[in-house]
Regions:
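A structural signal for short, hydrophobic/glycine-enriched beta-strand patches
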Residues: 1-126
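A general structural signal for short secondary-structure boundary/capping elements
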Residues: 100, 127-134, 151-159
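A transmembrane-helix-recognition feature enriched in membrane-embedded lipid enzymes
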Residues: 118-146
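The feature marks non-catalytic terminal segments
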Residues: 139-166
Length: 166
């Protein structure tokens, strides 16, 4: 099974995810974001809401990929198309390798035109956070950051990972 994994609720990412969903009509779509309007964008574009799963527990790239890890493993996916920004793809790729290992069936689908140089050092730090999670199962974050980010995402969607038992 092919999976389209959209990291975050950025409107341009949604547009790219929708294009992929139309090109791969049998693929499931996993949107890892607290932006609940994403599902509506997909359904407005004619994508069956039964194909879409919302992960509303993630608050950054590391949690995007660690929260969806179990789901994607259970779905026995043969390939995962990761939809993200071009400047974000370097970080997302590093974190994907830390979470899934080098054998990951992932393909980055970035859009945009430039790379943010500040993102490189941040990406390396997040790589080690993800690697620590992969080795120990522990996510390490400042408590105040986690609480601040989690307070933004209080609602749940019909197709959330929480309701699916993940």
């Amino acid at each position: 099974m092919d999976i389209i994994l959209q990291l975050g609720g950025n409107p341009a990412r949604s547009e790219t995810g929708i294009e992929l969903a139309k090109a791969y009509p049998d693929a499931k779509v996993v949107i890892s974001t607290g932006e609940h309007s994403c599902l509506q964008k997909y359904t407005d574009a004619g994508i069956d809401p039964e194909r879409v799963i919302i992960d509303d527990e993630a608050w950054d790239t590391v949690t995007n990929l660690t929260h969806t890890y179990k789901l994607l493993k259970r779905m026995n996916c043969k390939s995962v198309y990761v939809v993200t920004d071009l400047f974000h793809s370097y970080r997302a790729n590093l974190i994907t390798m830390a979470v899934w290992g080098c054998r990951a069936p992932f393909y980055m689908v970035p859009y945009g035109i430039s790379v943010n140089k500040k993102d490189e050092s941040y990406a390396i730090g997040q790589f080690f956070v993800a690697l620590l999670w992969r080795l120990t199962g522990v996510l390490v974050y400042e408590k105040r950051l986690k609480e601040k980010r989690k307070s933004i995402y209080t609602e749940t969607e019909k197709h959330s990972l929480f309701e699916l038992g993940f």
